[in-house]
């Protein structure tokens, strides 16, 4: 089915373009949401009359979207979740979780605007795109952590794959092993024993 796009649709086309889409996509998504018209001769003439009004509305919507984008561009959102020692979450962080964090900060975002291919299932800092308008897209970072302290460590860029206590213990064990297996220290001890035997 051929349709005339009334606004920019991602991965499909720009406003005013005539594109061929599957019937179900047109009937269930594009036409009911007012994103397109069937590409008949009457609708083509209707679009030409509506073109100036549609472009003016698009410019207004884009200006509002730019204001929202300036508020959230580069923002870091912290989501606390339970996770295993290896950093795998017991569950996942979904679009709904991200939206609730922005709503708590006073920014309204629709589910369809968050471009998340798959749920986040690991601890760390993840970059996520948000399309506040078909022509305006921003990137935000989502920090997933077990606690607020761990979130701060992640944001500072520290490695959280092991606990700090474990890292300190490993460093001490390595230093002790270095002293124990130091070949020069071992030879000095043998020379002292040989001198004592004589």
From Swiss-Prot:
What is the name of the protein in this document?
Large ribosomal subunit protein bL9
Tell me which NCBIfam families the record gives. L9
State the GO CC annotations.
ribonucleoprotein complex; ribosome
- Gene encoding this polypeptide? rplI
Write out the biased-composition intervals (Basic and acidic residues).
156-166
Supply the HAMAP family for this chain: Ribosomal_bL9
**What's this protein's function?**
Binds to the 23S rRNA.
- One Pfam family named in its UniProt record: Ribosomal_L9_N
Which InterPro entries does its entry note?
Answer: Ribosomal_bL9 (IPR000244), Ribosomal_bL9/RNase_H1_N (IPR009027), Ribosomal_bL9_bac/chp (IPR020594), Ribosomal_bL9_C (IPR020069), Ribosomal_bL9_C_sf (IPR036791), Ribosomal_bL9_N (IPR020070), Ribosomal_bL9_N_sf (IPR036935)
Q: Which GO terms describe its molecular function?
A: rRNA binding; structural constituent of ribosome
């Amino acid at each position: 089915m051929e349709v005339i796009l009334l606004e920019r649709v991602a991965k499909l086309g720009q406003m005013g373009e005539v594109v061929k889409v599957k019937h179900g996509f047109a009937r269930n998504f594009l036409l009911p949401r007012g994103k397109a018209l069937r590409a008949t001769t009457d609708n083509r003439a209707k679009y030409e009359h509506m073109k100036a009004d549609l472009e003016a509305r698009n410019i207004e919507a884009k200006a509002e979207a730019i204001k929202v984008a300036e508020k959230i561009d580069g923002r870091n959102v912290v989501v606390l979740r339970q996770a295993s020692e290896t950093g795998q979450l017991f569950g996942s962080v979904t679009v709904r979780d991200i939206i609730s964090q922005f709503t708590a900060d006073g920014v309204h975002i629709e589910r369809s605007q968050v471009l998340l291919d798959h749920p986040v299932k690991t601890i760390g800092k993840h970059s996520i795109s948000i399309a506040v308008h078909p022509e305006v897209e921003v990137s935000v970072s989502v920090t997933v952590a077990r606690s607020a302290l761990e979130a701060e460590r992640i944001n500072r860029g520290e490695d959280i794959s092991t606990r700090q206590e474990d890292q300190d213990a490993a460093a001490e064990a390595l230093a002790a092993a270095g002293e124990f297996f130091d070949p020069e220290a071992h030879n000095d001890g043998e020379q002292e024993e040989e001198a004592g035997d004589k």
